[in-house]
Amino acid sequence: MLYLFNNHKLNHKMKKHLLTSIFSLFLVFLTFAQNKSHWAEVKDNNFPLSKNSQRESFPKEFKVMQLDLNLLKQSLSVVPNRLKSKTSNVIISIPNTDGVLERFQIFEASNFEPELQAQFPEIRSYVGVGIDDKLAILRMSLDPNGIQAMIFRTDKRNEFIEPYSADGRIYAIFTSSRIKGKLPFTCSTQDQSLANRLSEKAGKQSETLRSSSSELLTFRLALSCVAEYSNYFGATNSSQVGLVLAAFNATMTRVNGVFEKDFTIHMNIIANTTNVIYYAAASDPYSPGATGAGGAWNAELQSTLTSVIGEANYDIGHLFGASGGGGNAGCIGCVCDSGKGSGFTSPANGIPSGDTFDIDYVAHEMGHQFGANHTFSHSNEGSGVNMEPGSGSTIMGYAGITSRDVQSNSDDYFHYASIFQVETNMESKTCPTRTSIANTDAPTVNAGLNYTIPKSTPFILTGTASDPNGVLTYCWEQIDNAGATQINANSAANVTKASGPNWRSYDPVSVPSRYFPRIQSIIANSATTAGLEINVEALSSVARTLNF
């Protein structure tokens, strides 16, 4: 976890009774303001739905709550910067999927460069540290039209909050388990491999990677969009640029939340990004959706950023489209370098917002730009990191868009292989700003000894770890790369599979042990665990080596 905060009580000694009384009244008012709920149950179900909630991939099960946006804004009027303060007196409540309000200690975590943030003070991004659930982390964006939020959980599914009514009063709270859509997204990024560098470091378990350096890396993000994207959010000219920046901010709040957690990386949108936001399709420098998403946007974006922004003025460039159903990073691991401004993401359903767009698509393509290859094994790209069965389930997989899906959506974290690739790539990068963070001690981790066990025998892996800065979470992942023949139907977990991935990744938990297969499968006396379309766990009935 990147940020760990401690609560501190304010202790003041007042010499005069008058000052004591005034201060006491202030504390009473502050407590009342923060305890007064911003949320209420929905009593009237007669309201128009937001465009985002009408997408096919929107969950079927969710909780709806009504938000008093003005009251929330008042509570957030003075929030400390997380990099300048270790404590905050701002506490707000956020509903979970059961409708229960949970308290979070709030800090500002802007996605804008200071100049851009000063120009648009009404668009904000926050991080919250759980009080009632001490392992919960909130990432929330705020703009004049409402909020979007993402809550990282431990031992249960992560949660999302998105506008459900068109007027931004009613919100849907749902988990990250979503239905599979019928409009596939295709990532056409060529897997130019960092495999050589990865292989050089393979097996060097004692080597300390960049993530242990106690530094947050901040990159300057030049974010552009096609006119269709701006129009989707109601912006038809430059006077409405705030509508587009609010959408940028909502997406990057979630993307940065994941990148900070897994990579200790943050991206700030540059002030001049407003110069590459377009409003009229006839005059923007980008091809129509079908052609652009087919690959034309790579070169068009790079040319636009070079001429309008200047290569010295950004570290990573990306384009948001609104249709076409494709993504392409342009290159892999090229932040700071040639080709750094050629990545794009565009949905197939005409809805460039929401959890699917943010996590499954944008985080995936930006993951490529920072150095991560695909981790699925339904096809083999020779990168050395096809370590997940079938579609995979982590961000660099293809969950929900293949014919061999582990599940219908990506989980909002990166596989170990992706983290290793990105951290390896970051060691040679000089363009980011480096900021020391409070969490200075890397966890001490021991995965245990190697074992030989009988075939078809269930087993448990238990590690040990300690960290003086806070509570740890644990995620066991298999790290065996798929062979050339272990694709398509052979990418599924199988008891006779002699090599390659046979165990899917599951969300991090608070305990250091994992059952193989899942305890439910063991109780059912089954050697396999079924996923959405394939088996995702299988006890080997043949001799083989497994690496975790």
Which residues fall in each region the model found?
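Proline/serine/threonine-rich low-complexity linkers at boundaries of modular beta-sandwich domains
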Residues: 426-444
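N-terminal prosegments of processed precursors
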Residues: 34-166, 297
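The catalytic-center signature of Zn2+-dependent metalloproteases
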Residues: 270-296, 336-413, 477, 481-492
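Extracellular acidic, Ser/Thr/Pro-rich low-complexity tracts
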Residues: 453, 464-469
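Bacterial Sec-dependent N-terminal signal peptides
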Residues: 1-38
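Exoplasmic/lumenal beta-rich domain surfaces
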Residues: 268, 475-545
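Fold-level signature of zinc-dependent metallopeptidase catalytic domains
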Residues: 33-62, 170-332
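Short, solvent-exposed loop/linker segments at the N-terminal edge
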Residues: 447, 451-459
